[in-house]
Amino acid sequence: MPGMNRDHTDHTARRFNHALRYLHAHYNSDSLDLHRLAEEAALSPWHWHRLYRSLMGETPYETIKWMRLHRAAWLLRNSDASVATIARHCGYRGNVQSFNRTFRAAYGLNPQDYRARIHREYPLTIDTQPPIAIAYLPHADDYLFLSNTFNRLKIHLHLRGQYCRTLRAFSIHLPEALRGECGVAFALPPENICAPLLTGTIAGGRYAVLHYHGPYADLDAVCEHLLHRRLPSLGEQAADAPVILEYLDDSHAAPQQQYRVNISVPLQPTPQEPV
């Protein structure tokens, strides 16, 4: 936070990230206890709850609920497990009705209808984009858990007075490994960026930009369709360069079915363009 000295800021960030790691490892567990989270941060429950809400814009309970529903949505689209099994895996043990109500409130559909719905085609444009300076962190986990690294990045910037809701947020992926290692980033100039953050640039150039609208749990399937079906049908090919996802909404401030994401795929030069 503004006014903290560097040592105090780093100490607070370490404690907060320690608690976040515990939350991310146990969010699906019956044994998760919000008092234990406070212990992991070496804070009283009152101070932990106050600090968490100040930095994250929501309560720990709201974060846990979002993570559980996000995992449930991904499992509904990417597994054959029954709704009851998915509900148990996502913290709704023995209470499928409660899971159905909560899921519908977040996604606008009950779990069965969400699983059965057909992917739609989204608007696509091709344009030239300028380079963008970024501050980023690497993400070595599955894409499903991308929010974990975004939270770490957000906390680091927040404690240094460098975060605001208008910052452009990105994830950066190798085109053939959308579920593998990647980076998460905010658009920031390199000045005053310090460890553990890294600085870099999203390359400018010619991109196909798909304007996606819907839950994050569908993004990997939408990207695969764009890369391997839609672009070839337009006579375009992806360049051997990272795919960029720009997140246009605060994930905890908008309904999950209303999220907007621009998926930007760098394109190979056309015959008329210089290589």
Regions of interest found by a model, annotated:
Residues 2-6, 35-55:
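Basic, low-complexity segments
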Residues 30-38, 83-88:
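Short, charged low-complexity linear motifs
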Residues 8, 22-23, 71, 142:
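A generic structural signal for short
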Residues 18-32, 52, 73-82, 103:
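Basic, amphipathic alpha-helical hairpins
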Residues 42, 46-49, 58, 62-66, ...:
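A solvent-exposed interaction/effector surface
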Residues 1-18, 55-59, 65-66:
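Short, Lys/Arg-enriched, Trp-marked, Pro/Gly-tolerant hinge/linker segments that flank
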